[in-house]
Structures are given as structure tokens and as C-alpha cells.
Design a protein with these regions (language model features):
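Signature of N-terminal electron-transfer/Fe-S-associated modules in redox systems
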Residues: 1-117
Length: 117
């Protein structure tokens, strides 16, 4: 049995889980904020945090998450830092079409966690 947290909630799944974190988030948990674009880990639209580190969910297998903490854009209502980042993006018009914005918001949080102001 694999155990990890997803936005603060404990998750338990079978060890044989062979799907990517992106597939798990979108298809099992119905969390559509994390997007799929390149499917190779290059574009960043699928970015989430794993133990506070920026991670491309399209190339990360769920079976590698045992004991880890995963945070997605869906955690924004519970996370003041994500809320401030989202509002900052809106204030300067940094949303473009919005498709990859969740990944950019998560990347910004990772940057600020590792290089606080």
C-alpha cells in the first residue's frame, strides 16, 4: 500500500499503481486544475509541489510518492501563499489564456519557498 498526502488529505492506494501523478489527479481524483500539454515534462503546465519541490506530474509515477506530500493548485482556498500569488498574477495581467497559469502559480510558490523575499 502506498501512502501520501494530497493537499493535506491522506491517500492510500495499491502498490502496483503504474499511472502518472497527472493521470491520477485528473482521472481518479477529478482534479482538473493541473493541466496536460507536452506530456514530456518540458512545458510546466502540469507542475505541482512534492515535498515543497516543483515537480512535473506528467512524468512522475504515483508509485514514487510513498511518504511524500503533494500539493496542487486546488489547495489555493486553504493556502494564503497560493492566494497571494494568484492575485498578483491577476493584478499584472499575467494570466494569458489561463491554461498553463496553474503550473506557473505552483512554480512561483516553489521559487518563493526556496528563495524567500
Amino acid at each position: 500500500m502506498l501512502r501520501f498526502t494530497l493537499n493535506g488529505t491522506q491517500i492510500e492506494i495499491e502498490d502496483g499503481e503504474n499511472r502518472t501523478l497527472l493521470e491520477y489527479l485528473r482521472n481518479v481524483k477529478c482534479m482538473k486544475g493541473t493541466k496536460e500539454a507536452c506530456s514530456t515534462g518540458h512545458c510546466g503546465a502540469c507542475s505541482v509541489l512534492v515535498d515543497g519541490r516543483l515537480t512535473r506530474s506528467c512524468v512522475t509515477l504515483v508509485r514514487r510518492l510513498d511518504g511524500k506530500a503533494v500539493e496542487t493548485i486546488e489547495n489555493a482556498p486553504n493556502d494564503t501563499m497560493l492566494q497571494v500569488i494568484q492575485h498578483s498574477f491577476l493584478d499584472v495581467g499575467a494570466v494569458q489564456c489561463g491554461f498553463c497559469t496553474p503550473g506557473m502559480v505552483m512554480a512561483t510558490k516553489a521559487l518563493l519557498l526556496h528563495y524567500p523575499a
